[in-house]
């Protein structure tokens, strides 16, 4: 029961024992009000303490005190891991749910320093090891200025990334590896009969190509995507080509029956935890949207929730972003490197996020993929889906032409130095997913 006079808990059955008060004062020389200890096996109790040393369990109380100390120590040790791991990557954002103007100014100052390094001619001429050293030096200076969190810098040489955490808690990175070089190759042309047949197709849905490989200026890649957009639009698939892809654009992917992610990807590893450091690794889709003050404010919640990351001063998104942002029931085809992770660490986070938002099916690649291989696979797959095939049928057809992985294709082109690990397509969701069918049952039966 709570004693309202002094706020302590007492034993109502012995609270009126005057002898107990006297004995207690003789024992420790002071009032015991409000002090607690273990209960003895025998003897009257007041305020959770034995009445005194004379026959009231003083000898028994000493080991009890020791037990209490040990219990408290054990509880503290038990609580430490809980506290150390309490701030998981997702939960860190809960501490702060919006960016202030001061936060954004700090990030912009850090981004300016990072991009000054990564956009320099000296950086382009450096080896990966030299880039890592330069990145670490830059981040050390930013840490000294209070713009980067102390102890947050992590070097992932295997995946060509140096990650860090801004002082506000958002995640950032410096990419030190170059993306796969473009090996220009013309798209295979369809036969005249096929062109005529496809030209007679009715509308088979809508599509969007999210092109962020480059800024399209003097680009070796862009003309192929412009051709695909024009061609698909002419044969029944109403196609939009987005060459200035933003985080906001990706939020509207659910408006289309087919979405194509034509951009670079990366594997991002970062550290978290304040006592015992832990690492987390995830695939990222890299955009060409440069960070600025107002965009940081607009994307502030996603940045703090670690759904959006800034790499080389530009935005990138992960699987949690799609889980939060995608709302649709379309098909998603990705050309990005490591969309499904890599050998030994296949990661379905991207696809899982899209499927959680309602996507019918997702296709992407494990490992770094040759851009010409992924583009050729895309071309063949979409053309077959326009003809009415399922996603699985269309992908199998593309594999029959270009090979089941990109090293097979590379060797058939006469290549002599393939990259380390073959890239291959993976499917998630409904393998029987198709584009909208514009034909009635009678028309389909007549065509058969």
Label each region the model flagged:
Residues 3, 10-11, 27, 45-47, ...:
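Short, positively charged and aromatic/hydrophobic N-terminal segments
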Residues 79-90:
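Sec-dependent signal peptide cleavage junction
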Residues 91-146:
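Short Lys/Arg-enriched alpha/beta "domain-start" segment
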Residues 99, 103-119, 185-290, 300:
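A domain-level signal for caspase-like cysteine endopeptidase catalytic cores
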Residues 268-361:
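Cysteine protease catalytic core and zymogen-processing segment of caspase-like enzymes
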Residues 331-447:
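Active-site-proximal C-terminal subdomain of hydrolase catalytic domains
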């Amino acid at each position: 029961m709570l004693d309202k006079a002094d706020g302590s808990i007492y034993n109502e059955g012995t609270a009126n024992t005057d002898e107990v008060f006297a004995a207690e004062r003789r024992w420790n020389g002071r009032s015991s009000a409000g002090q607690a200890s273990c209960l003895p096996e025998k003897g009257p109790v007041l305020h959770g303490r034995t009445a005194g040393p004379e026959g009231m369990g003083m000898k028994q109380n000493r080991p009890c005190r020791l037990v209490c100390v040990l219990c408290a120590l054990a509880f503290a040790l038990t609580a430490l891991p809980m506290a150390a791991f309490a701030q998981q990557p997702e939960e860190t954002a809960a501490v702060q749910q919006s960016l202030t103007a001061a936060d954004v100014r700090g990030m912009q100052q850090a981004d300016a320093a990072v991009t000054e390094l990564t956009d320099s001619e000296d950086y382009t001429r450096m080896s990966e090891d030299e880039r890592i050293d330069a990145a670490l030096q830059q981040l050390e200076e930013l840490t000294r200025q209070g713009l980067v969190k102390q102890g947050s810098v992590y070097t992932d040489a295997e995946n060509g990334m140096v990650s860090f955490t801004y002082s506000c808690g958002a995640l950032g990175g410096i990419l030190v590896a170059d993306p796969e070089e473009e090996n220009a190759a013309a798209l295979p042309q369809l036969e005249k009969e096929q062109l005529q047949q496809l030209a007679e197709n009715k509308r088979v849905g809508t599509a969007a190509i999210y092109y962020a490989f480059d800024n399209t200026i003097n680009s070796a890649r862009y003309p192929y995507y412009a051709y695909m957009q024009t061609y698909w639009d002419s044969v029944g698939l109403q196609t939009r080509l987005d060459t200035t892809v933003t985080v906001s654009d990706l939020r509207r992917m659910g408006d289309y029956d087919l979405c194509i992610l034509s951009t670079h990807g990366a594997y991002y590893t970062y550290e978290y935890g304040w006592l015992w450091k832990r690492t987390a690794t995830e695939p990222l889709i890299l955009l060409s949207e440069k960070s600025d003050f107002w965009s940081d404010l607009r994307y502030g919640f996603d940045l703090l929730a670690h759904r959006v990351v800034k790499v080389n001063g530009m935005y990138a998104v992960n699987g949690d972003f799609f889980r939060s942002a995608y709302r649709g029931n379309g098909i998603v085809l990705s050309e990005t490197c490591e969309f499904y992770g890599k050998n030994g660490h296949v990661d379905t986070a991207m696809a899982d996020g899209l499927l959680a938002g309602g996507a019918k099916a997702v296709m992407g690649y494990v490992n770094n993929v040759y851009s010409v291989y992924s583009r050729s696979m895309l071309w063949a797959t979409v053309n077959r889906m326009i003809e009415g095939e399922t996603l699985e049928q269309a992908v199998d057809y593309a594999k029959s032409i270009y090979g089941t992985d990109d090293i097979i294709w590379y060797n058939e082109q006469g290549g002599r130095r393939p990259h380390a690990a073959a890239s291959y397509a993976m499917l998630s969701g409904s393998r029987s997913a198709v584009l909208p069918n514009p034909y009635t049952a009678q028309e389909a039966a007549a065509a058969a």
